[in-house]
């Protein structure tokens, strides 16, 4: 028998997080406390839909979450098929069950979970004004990141080109891999021209150059862009297997980016990977502004994929009121240190 308790929490960013959908100052999450009533063991999960972005960012989310948790606790298992439309809820349940079943934060046995190997990550440059972004780029370069991802679309395009030129004046493509994320900021009419201008800086890839939902436009861009395109928002809400196949076969992207909270939980992300690999499409894994509870789950799973290219797993460190986890960014890798003490869940959740 299981019980599932829902603990809402508002997290506060250390500094405003600028995205294409505005600036985040706080972050609403729902923690799930799953308890085995026979053994007393528990697992903690995190449901963290992104406002105006997640397909399950619904007005009645708390009620829906309560109903699903009640049903899951009664059944004793996760209804993966039934939860396809609700990726953030599925991810929270997956995380809670994985934690309980492992009775440890080391959900799977990997060199990462044993503290023997880090996961390479990119240094993320948030949207901001020119001076802010310039300073952040300097910090990431000094910290030793070999892959830097710059969010673009917030300031004038010419100024963004200046920022990329600044990086390339100091580091060649062999020294630092550059990725950009447009978050759908380009118009279909301007996109190819801007991609051609960006190509001057020997970029690894660009995420979501145009707004999601324009499959034919994106298909044409993926076929004609001088450097690779990665789909991100395009995958949101594409939850059924047949639709995933149709999307990949229509657009034929070079990469897809997988965020379990947005793209079907861990189970749904695995399905995306299988379908992508069958088509020769690359991928990497990214967190989506979760706290350390969600970040650890994503990182533990990501490590089972044995990633070689940099992943997007640094965002758990963004909050002033995060829970302490044995996760650390060292150089340009995320490390897990199992010898460190486990988080103080009773105090943090104030319910156990």
What are these regions (language model features)?
Residues 9-12, 127, 235, 289, ...:
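Short, solvent-exposed coil/turn elements at secondary-structure transition points
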Residues 123, 257, 312-313:
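Structural signal for conserved beta-strand scaffold positions within catalytic alpha/beta enzyme cores
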Residues 47, 208, 313:
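Active-site donor-binding loop signature of nucleotide-sugar glycosyltransferases
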Residues 155-296, 300, 319-330:
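Catalytic core of soluble alpha/beta enzymes
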Residues 69, 76-79, 254, 279-285, ...:
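A short pocket-lining beta-strand/turn micro-motif at the edge of beta-sheets
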Residues 1-178, 183-185, 189-192, 199, ...:
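N-terminal capping/lid subdomain adjacent to the active-site entrance of alpha/beta enzymes
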Residues 288-352:
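C-terminal alpha-helical cap/extension of soluble enzyme domains
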Residues 2-7, 14, 92-94, 201-202, ...:
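N-terminal start-of-chain detector that recognizes signal peptides
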């Amino acid at each position: 028998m299981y019980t599932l308790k829902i603990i809402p929490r508002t997290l506060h960013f250390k500094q405003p997080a600028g995205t294409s959908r505005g600036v985040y100052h706080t972050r609403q999450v729902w923690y799930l406390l799953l308890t085995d009533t026979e053994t007393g063991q528990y697992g903690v999960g995190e449901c963290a839909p992104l406002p105006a972005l997640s397909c399950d960012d619904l007005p009645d989310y708390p009620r829906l979450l309560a109903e699903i948790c009640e049903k899951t606790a009664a059944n004793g298992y996760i209804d993966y098929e039934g939860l396809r439309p609700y990726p953030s809820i599925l991810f929270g349940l997956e995380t809670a069950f994985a934690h309980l079943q492992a009775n440890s934060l080391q959900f799977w046995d990997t060199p990462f979970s044993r503290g023997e190997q880090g996961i390479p990550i990119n240094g993320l440059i948030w949207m901001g004004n020119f001076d802010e972004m310039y300073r952040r780029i300097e910090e990431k370069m000094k910290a030793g990141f070999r892959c830097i991802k710059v969010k673009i679309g917030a300031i004038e395009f010419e100024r963004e080109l200046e920022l990329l030129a600044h990086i390339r004046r100091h580091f060649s493509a062999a020294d630092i891999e550059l990725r950009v994320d447009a978050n759908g900021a380009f118009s279909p009419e301007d996109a190819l021209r801007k991609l051609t201008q960006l190509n001057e800086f020997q970029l690894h890839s660009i995420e979501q150059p145009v707004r999601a939902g324009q499959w034919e436009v994106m298909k044409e861009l993926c076929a004609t862009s001088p450097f690779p395109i990665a789909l991100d928002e395009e995958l949101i809400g594409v939850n059924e297997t047949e639709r995933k196949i149709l999307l990949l076969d229509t657009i034929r992207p070079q990469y897809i980016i997988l965020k379990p909270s947005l793209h079907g939980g861990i189970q749904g992300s695995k399905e995306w990977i299988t379908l992508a690999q069958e088509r020769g499409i690359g991928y990497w894994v990214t967190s989506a502004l979760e706290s350390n509870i969600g970040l650890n789950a994503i990182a533990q799973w990501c490590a089972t994929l044995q990633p070689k290219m940099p992943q997007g797993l640094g965002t758990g460190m963004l909050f002033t009121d995060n829970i302490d986890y044995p996760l650390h960014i060292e150089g340009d890798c995320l490390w897990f240190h199992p010898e460190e003490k486990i988080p103080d869940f009773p105090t943090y959740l104030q319910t156990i």
